[in-house]
A protein has these predicted regions:
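Positively charged n-region of N-terminal signal peptides that target proteins for export
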Residues: 1-5
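Sequence-pattern detector for short linear motifs
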Residues: 7-8, 210
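Bacterial N-terminal signal peptides
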Residues: 8-20
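Exported/periplasmic ABC-transporter solute-binding proteins
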Residues: 20-56, 60-65, 69-77, 86-89, ...
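Short acidic/histidine-rich motifs immediately flanking catalytic phosphotransfer sites
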Residues: 79-81
């Protein structure tokens, strides 16, 4: 367990350590927020960041993007994150879920996620994509059984929400025979890359990832029925140990405002009810 925690922290340090070279802080009084977010949100969050920083020049938003499961493990291991945005709002239940050690301890533990969180941030849809020149033409989930589809990329269900939703769809439709075709990936962007390069015959990604792929790189074969998996809801949550809670709350409020909502809808995300 200790080894896993050390590994998670080291991965976090490597991921975040390079940020200072990308965007150095110019003034000592400049404040910063460190956000760990699902990689499927990278494009939209960077646009929201630009809008926020233009209105708040004294603030710098720094991102640590990755698979939601990996980010969750970093947070549970003590990574100094201010804000977490997961592709599966259910991940927040795991963050404060007692492990074996804490469950046997009489000393109460401090909640990692602040009171009142998580909150819904956005929604998405699951689709199946194939390489642009693919001659295989699956039009529905049951077509994935065809012999022409030998390798199907999917995010690792243990750590990648998109893979978890796809796994739920496989189980709900009793398509267990598909498992021998599955190629597990670290995150949904890796699934997309594998399909673009033709290393697999198809893969499950979010509709927004398929939409943002360069024109002609992939082809969307079909949308997975939302009845086959849990609702795809991205969740946002401030950490109790955030260095500047008020500033984090200000950024969360901004992301729920009209500018960021417009960015989300333009990218194909679904909006939560306000």
């Amino acid at each position: 367990m200790l080894t896993k925690k050390i590994a998670a922290i080291l991965l976090f340090i490597v991921a975040v350590g390079s940020l200072s070279f990308i965007a150095p802080v110019n003034a000592a009084e400049q404040k910063s927020i460190l956000v760990s977010a699902a990689v499927s949100l990278k494009n939209v969050l960077e646009q929201c960041q630009k809008c926020f920083e233009e209105k708040n020049p004294d603030v710098k938003i720094k991102f640590n993007f990755g698979g939601s499961g990996m980010l969750l493990n970093q947070i549970k291991s003590g990574a100094p994150i201010d804000l977490f945005i997961s592709a599966d709002i259910r991940d927040f239940e795991k963050i404060d879920a007692p492990d074996t050690a804490s469950a046997t301890s009489e000393k109460p533990s401090t909640k990692i996620i602040a009171e009142g969180y998580p909150k819904p941030f956005a929604g998405n849809e699951l689709v199946f994509i194939v390489p642009k020149n693919s001659e295989a033409g699956p039009l529905a989930f049951e077509d994935l059984r065809m012999d022409a589809l030998k390798k199907i990329a999917i995010g690792n269900p243990k750590t990648v929400p998109a893979g978890r939703y796809a796994d739920e769809a496989i189980r709900s439709g009793r398509y267990e025979a598909l498992r021998e075709k599955l190629v597990l990936c670290e995150n949904v962007r890796q699934v997309l890359d594998y399909v673009i390069r033709g290393e697999v015959d198809g893969g499950f990604v979010y509709r927004t990832d398929a939409t943002q792929a360069a024109a002609g790189e992939i082809r969307q074969a079909f949308a997975v029925s939302p009845e086959m998996h849990a609702p795809i809801v991205y969740g946002v949550g401030r950490l109790t140990a955030a260095n500047n809670p008020e500033l984090v709350e200000r950024f969360i409020a901004f992301m729920a405002g009209p500018e960021c909502r417009e960015i989300l809808t333009a990218a194909g995300f679904l909006l939560p009810k306000q």
